Amino acid sequence: LCIGDLHEPFCLDGYLDFCVDIYNSWDCDRIIFIGDVIDNHFSSYHETDADGLGGMDELELAIEKLKPWHDTFPDADVTIGNHDRMIMRKAQSSNIPTHWIKEYKDALGTPTWNFTERVVVDNVQYIHGEGGTARSRCIKDMQSTIQGHLHTQCYSEWKVGSRARIFGAQVGCGIDKDAYAMAYAKNFPKPAIACLVCIDGETVINEMMPL
């Protein structure tokens, strides 16, 4: 099961239960979070909400809201998203060596999660997806690709040639579009609230959450 961007503490109520239902209904045996498990709105390089939570308050709430995810799916890979790495970027901007920075799993109270840039399962690569759409990335890398990042996109699309076939798939996300941290996207298309099941690297199912 591949779970979309959470952006905790701004994840949509009910998304965890939905993901659990999909995991059980397809008898899944592996979990991959596609990245941006936290939002880090307070430390954004863009304008932040003046009435929003301060840094420690947002972090503590994000940790609190990640705990049920970690309790439910303790063995998981997490591809590191642009929002996840925001604090690391701020540290680099301040010339702070990485030796001083905690690992993601330690800072977020998720000790058994594996945070990584890329996961490959059944010859399918899972990445967060800042570099473009899944349909273009799979062609660029000549490898089936599943990614997140683009909240409004949810699809699977095959590219078939004379000697090979690959697919690109967008997972969708689990964000609460009405949260203040998502105000920047108020005039964007609605987010696709969904997760994705990939079976043996060949069958891809986009599961949309009933809303």
Per-segment meaning from a language model:
Residues C2-G4, I146-Q147:
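Short hydrophobic beta-strand that contains or immediately precedes a catalytic carboxylate
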Residues I3-A107:
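Core catalytic region of metal-dependent phosphoesterases/phosphodiesterases
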Residues F73-D75, T110, N123, R165:
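A generic structural signal for alpha->beta connector loops
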Residues D77, P111-T116, I127, A169:
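General small-molecule cofactor/ligand-binding pocket signal
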Residues V78-H83, N114-E117, N206-P210:
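Acidic carboxylate-rich catalytic motifs and surrounding loops in phosphoryl-/glycosyl-chemistry enzymes
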Residues Y104-L108, K159-S162:
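Short, conserved catalytic or adaptor-binding loops enriched in Gly and charged residues
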Residues K105-V121, E130-T133:
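Short acidic low-complexity segments
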Residues V120-E207:
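Conserved beta-sheet core of the metallophosphoesterase superfamily
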